Amino acid sequence: MASPQLRGYGVQAIPVLLLLLLLLLLPLRVTPGTTCPPPVSIEHADIRVKNYSVNSRERYVCNSGFKRKAGTSTLIECVINKNTNVAHWTTPSLKCIRDPSLAHYSPVPTVVTPKVTSQPESPSPSAKEPEAFSPKSDTAMTTETAIMPGSRLTPSQTTSAGTTGTGSHKSSRAPSLAATMTLEPTASTSLRITEISPHSSKMTKVAISTSVLLVGAGVVMAFLAWYIKSRQPSQPCRVEVETMETVPMTVRASSKEDEDTGA
C-alpha cells in the first residue's frame, strides 16, 4: 500500500495535469493589433484594402475591358495561422479575362507630331510667275503661304490616305541658297516649298523681256509686209488712167492737123 505522503502528492498533481490538458485543447489566442500584410497582386485586377485586421474581407475589381472568369471569386479574407500565429490573406482564385463584348471597339489612335525637314535643292528656272513661302521668324502652331515674285511653290508628294494635318514649324530664308522644306506628318499631305535664288529670277526676267522684243519685231515686220503688198495693186490702175488721158489729147491734135491740111 502507498503511504499517505505519496497519496497527497498525487492529489495535488491532478489539477496541474488538468490545466495543461486544457491549455493544449484551447486554440491559440490572437495577439491584439495583429494585421495582415498587403494582398498579392492579380493580373488585370486591382484591390483597395480598407481594413487589414483579422477576419476582415476585401474584394478584387477587374480593370476596364476585362471581366471575372466564371468559377473564380473576387473575395479574400484575413485569417490567422493557428500553428505559427501569423495573420495572412486567403489565396485568391480570381482570374480576369478580356470582355468579348468590347472586342469590336478599336483603340484610340495615337497623335503623331509632324516633322519638318529642310534640304538644299538646285533651283530650276521657269517662265511662269513663281510663288513663295513667306518666312515668319519665331512663329509656332501656324503656317502661312504668300504669293511673291522670285519664289516657287511645288507639290512634292501625293496625298496619302487619311486626313491631312498641318504641323507647327519655323521657316528661315537664305538669299543665295535654294532651300526645300518638306512637311512629313503620318497620314497627311506633304508640300515641298522651293525658293529660287535672285540670279535665277533675273535670268527669268531677261528671258521674258527677250521674248517680248521678238514678238514685237515680228508684229512690225508683218505690218510692213502687209503695207507693201497693199501698195502694189494701185500702180497699174494709175498707169491705165494716165494712158486714157494721153490718148484723147493725141486724137485732138491729129484732128486739128487734118483740118489745117484740108483748108
Curated annotation (Swiss-Prot):
Topological relation to the membrane, as annotated: Single-pass type I membrane protein
Expressing tissues: Widely expressed.
Parts of the chain on the Cytoplasmic side: 227-263
Compositionally biased region (Low complexity): 113-135, 154-169
Region (Disordered): 113-178
Cleaved signal peptide residues: 1-32
Subcellular localization: Membrane; Nucleus membrane; Cell surface
Extracellular side: 33-205
One GO MF term attached to the UniProt entry: interleukin-15 receptor activity
Record field: transmembrane: 206-226
Main location: membrane
Protein name in UniProt: Interleukin-15 receptor subunit alpha
Source organism of the structure: Mus musculus
